[in-house]
Every structure is written in structure tokens, then in C-alpha cells.
């Protein structure tokens, strides 16, 4: 609005990765898992789920149910669910066998209902033939991307003329949601040019 631009017509690709996948896959809001769907799933499986939803801003998954949280975190980290559980079992208060059964039941529930979650969209995008090409690709807040998101970025990156990736590992705030800041830091080994800004224009001084 400040620059007199129309978001849909002038900036059709100015989106979060989840929004871009949603758009490219031709999804509708009616086909997406909602909080009430998770509650219905919980009632069906006999587990309490008071909160379960994806942020519309950054696509992070939030739930008061530890089983759902671990299932989604393993997916965005691109890890085998039970191996991820085994690496954290000393700090988790959930059962291994129940975790596996719930993960499988959640897949069946979504299939029966014809619903997807935002993590499904990223996985489906990776299977889809990439049609768009970009002269310039700009990825912001890269320190907060999960490995699944990085896989999506690399697919888009491969069809971009020039790519800029911006981030600050000191501001990584989504490790709890599966963000892989180490992947961001390791980019210095494969990019042509790295520029470090000595002045923060968000926090002057």
C-alpha cells in the first residue's frame, strides 16, 4: 500500500514458502487442516488436543500435544520419526509405540478427510515439477528455515538467475520448531559472495 502496489498482481511471488507452495499446488483453505480437525482427530484417538494450528505468518506448527509436535518436528527436520524420538527420549514424556501409531493414524485421518497440513504442502511441492523461473530470488530470515524448507529453497534456487539469501544466525528464534541454523551457516562454503553488514538498520547504533 505504501508504494501503491497490488500484492496479488504486482507482487504475486512475494510470499512465505508455505504460501508459495499453497499457491503453486492450487490448494484452497477448505482443504487445509484446521484446529477443529485436530480436535476431532484427538477425540477419535482418545488423546487431549486443545491447541493445534499452523501460523499463517511463518508456517510454524503450534500444539499443546507433545505427540503432534514431535511428529511435525521430525518431518520438517527430514528425520525418521522413531530415530528422532530415540535421540530425545530422555526429555520426552510420551510413549514410543503410541507416537508411531498416532503418526500413522494422522495420515489416515487426513486422507479420509481429503485434508492437508502446511508440512504436507512443502513435501508435495518437492514432488511437483517446477514451472516458474525467476530472474532474481531473494530469501529473507534464512536462519529460521527448517531442512524441509531448505530443500524447497534449493529447488527454486536451481531455476533462478541470481539468488540473494539474507539472515542472521544470532537472531535464530525457531530452533524449537525445527529451524536448521547450522545449514544456514554452512552456506558460506558454497556461495560466491558473502557480505556482512556491520550496521543493523533494524536496531541502529
Stretches found by the model and what they are:
Residues 51-138, 147-152, 165, 175:
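Accessory N-terminal region flanking or inserted into the helicase ATPase core
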Residues 1-12, 16, 116, 120, ...:
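Short intrinsically disordered, low-complexity coil segments enriched in acidic
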Residues 10, 22, 111, 174, ...:
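Short, flexible active-site loop motifs that bind/organize anionic cofactors or intermediates
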Residues 15, 143-205:
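Conserved helicase motor core of SF1/SF2 NTP-dependent helicases
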Residues 2-7, 42-45, 121, 125-129, ...:
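Alpha-helix C-terminal capping segments
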Residues 20, 27, 74-77, 190:
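Phosphate/oxyanion-binding loops and surfaces in catalytic or ligand/nucleic-acid-binding neighborhoods
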Amino acid at each position: 500500500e505504501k508504494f501503491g502496489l497490488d500484492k496479488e498482481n504486482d507482487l504475486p511471488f512475494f510470499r512465505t514458502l508455505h504460501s508459495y507452495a499453497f499457491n503453486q499446488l492450487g490448494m484452497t483453505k477448505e482443504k487445509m487442516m484446521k484446529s477443529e480437525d485436530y480436535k476431532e482427530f484427538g477425540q477419535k484417538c482418545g488423546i487431549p488436543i486443545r491447541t493445534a494450528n499452523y501460523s499463517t505468518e511463518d508456517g510454524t506448527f503450534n500444539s499443546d500435544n507433545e505427540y503432534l509436535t514431535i511428529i511435525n518436528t521430525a518431518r520438517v527436520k527430514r528425520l525418521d520419526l522413531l530415530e528422532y524420538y530415540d535421540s530425545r527420549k530422555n526429555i520426552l514424556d510420551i510413549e514410543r509405540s503410541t507416537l508411531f501409531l498416532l503418526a500413522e493414524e494422522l495420515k489416515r485421518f487426513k486422507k479420509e478427510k481429503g485434508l492437508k497440513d502446511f508440512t504436507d504442502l512443502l513435501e508435495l511441492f518437492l514432488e511437483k515439477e517446477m514451472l516458474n523461473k525467476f530472474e532474481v530470488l531473494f530469501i529473507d530470515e534464512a536462519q529460521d528455515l527448517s531442512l524441509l524448507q531448505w530443500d524447497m529453497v534449493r529447488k527454486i534456487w536451481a531455476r533462478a538467475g541470481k539468488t540473494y539469501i539474507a539472515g542472521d544466525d544470532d537472531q535464530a528464534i525457531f530452533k524449537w520448531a525445527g529451524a536448521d541454523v547450522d545449514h544456514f551457516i554452512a552456506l558460506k562454503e558454497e556461495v560466491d559472495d558473502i557480505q556482512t553488514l556491520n550496521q543493523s538498520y533494524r536496531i541502529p547504533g
